[in-house]
Amino acid sequence: MSRIGKRPISIPSGVTATVEGQLVKAKGPKGELSYVVNDEVLVKFEENVISVMPRDQSKDARSKWGMSRSMIENIFCGVKDGFEKRLEINGVGYRAALQGKDIQLSLGFSHDVVYKVPSGVTVTVPKPTEIVISGIDKQQVGQVAAEIREYRRPEPYKGKGVKHADERIFRKEGKKK
């Protein structure tokens, strides 16, 4: 039994939701999103509350039950408040700068890395060592943050690289004589 899936989803104020078969649409102050729920899961819409139930008690249906509920809740949070991820850049000479809509990263390579920002996501660089990624789609914001971090992951000896703002790097001790 999914403990996450059992909880009903209340629609926040300022957000309108429609359910058409397996398609859930949400429209709010930040924009509009939709999510196609898996066929194994049944969606019911009653008076500002959406409930999600598995069609049968198979293991496959129950495994998709909680995920579907979380995805629907994420689209409501996204169109109301949006999502934001912060990245920090550590290292001598490591920096980021906006170049039009793209982001230019100096990460210690012989060339600068230019990352093309997809539509639906906005990237700002308040400081050369900080990147703020925001948008209404949680998956897309996280994907952009992961792709930028992947160019130079933080290394464990000095902590140089791109890391999430709330991430702790496990530091190792260097060689001993």
From Swiss-Prot:
It holds the Pfam family Ribosomal_L6. This protein binds to the 23S rRNA, and is important in its secondary structure. It is located near the subunit interface in the base of the L7/L12 stalk, and near the tRNA binding site of the peptidyltransferase center. HAMAP family: Ribosomal_uL6_B. Gene3D superfamilies: Ribosomal protein L6, alpha-beta domain. GO terms for biological process: cytoplasmic translation. GO terms for molecular function: rRNA binding; structural constituent of ribosome. Residues 155-177 are annotated as: Disordered. Keywords: Ribonucleoprotein, Ribosomal protein, RNA-binding, rRNA-binding. PANTHER family: 60S/50S RIBOSOMAL PROTEIN L6/L9, LARGE RIBOSOMAL SUBUNIT PROTEIN UL6M. Signal peptide: none annotated. It comes from the Bacteria. This is Large ribosomal subunit protein uL6. One of its GO terms (cellular component) is cytosolic large ribosomal subunit. Belongs to the universal ribosomal protein uL6 family. Part of the 50S ribosomal subunit.
